[in-house]
């Protein structure tokens, strides 16, 4: 049993695709919030 091959199979599964899509959306929203909220707090921007 190799963990690497198991992770690859899990990563390619449909569930993983949904999770990755959700993760990307969450990262985008998080980055957007950081940029919008951070620009007010950081002086000189």
Swiss-Prot record:
Coiled coil: none annotated. One of its GO terms (biological process) is monoatomic ion transport. Its main location: secreted. GO terms for molecular function: toxin activity. It is found in: Secreted; Target cell membrane. One of its GO terms (cellular component) is other organism cell membrane. Expressed by the venom gland. Keywords: Antibiotic, Antimicrobial, Cytolysis, Fungicide, Hemolysis, Ion transport, Membrane, Secreted, Target cell membrane, Target membrane, Toxin, Transmembrane, Transport. Transmembrane segments: none annotated. Monomer and homodimer. Belongs to the non-disulfide-bridged peptide (NDBP) superfamily. Long chain multifunctional peptide (group 2) family. At high concentrations, acts as a pore former in cellular membranes and causes the leakage of the cells. At submicromolar concentrations, degranulates granulocytes and has a weak hemolytic activity against human red blood cells. Also strongly inhibits the production of superoxide anions. Has a strong antibacterial activity against Gram-negative bacteria but is less active against Gram-positive bacteria. Also has antifungal activity. Induces reversible G-protein dependent Ca(2+) release from intracellular stores and increase Ca(2+) influx in HL-60 cells. This is Parabutoporin. It comes from Parabuthus schlechteri (Scorpion).
